Amino acid sequence: DLEQYFGILKDRKGLKGVQINDAISGRYYQKEAIQAVCDAIGERNRRKALLVMATGSGKTRTVISLADVLIRHGWVKNLLFLADRNALVTQAKRAFHNELPNLSLCDLTNSKEDANARAVFSTYQTMMNCIDAMRNEEGGRLFTPGHFDLIVVDEAHRSIYNKYKDIFTYFDALLVGLTATPKDEMDKNTYEIFELEVGVP
């Protein structure tokens, strides 16, 4: 884990004024969201971000584009996408495959797929089970605390965090939450999870 971490640190590029792939996320508000997360990570050393975007505004495309930027700038090698239902996991994996076809992908809910992929898609429950159960060739844990550099949480809200907080505390990774819940309707604990001032994602 440390070797991988120091390798990533050495290869990192600044995130100020990043080039965003318009083919993935061309809408101005998607670009603003990506740059805001990049600024928070790169300039303010934040490790958590929350994207509040209305249904149909392209949350998945925005996070794919964010992942693309972070990968190209050396901040992310492996990422984990978590959702609460299999259908959302499948949907997200398909979207990543369409936009980033060279990125190796794995749906953990499908046992036939290679869990050594750079982008892993899973339900929360499946990942909880896999942390202890999945082993590498040497017999150690496949998913060590430093395995992922970025965790994306689909529909981030307090009930998910309360139920599966062990996932978020186990992995030492950047955490990006996605939600369509309007800022003024969001539980204040959701802001606390992402270490944000209430009402200011």
Language-model region placement:
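Acidic/polar loop patches that form or flank catalytic/metal-binding clefts of enzymes
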Residues: 103-108, 176
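Post-DEXD/H (motif II) to motif III coupling segment of the RecA-like Helicase ATP-binding lobe
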Residues: 158-201
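Conserved ATPase-coupling elements of RecA-like P-loop NTPase cores
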Residues: 92, 130-134, 155-166
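ATP-dependent helicase/translocase motor core
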Residues: 1-78, 83, 87-102, 116-119, ...
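Walker B catalytic acidic pair
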Residues: 123, 154-155
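Conserved motor-coupling elements within RecA-like helicase/translocase cores
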Residues: 108-120
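Conserved H-loop
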Residues: 84, 155, 180
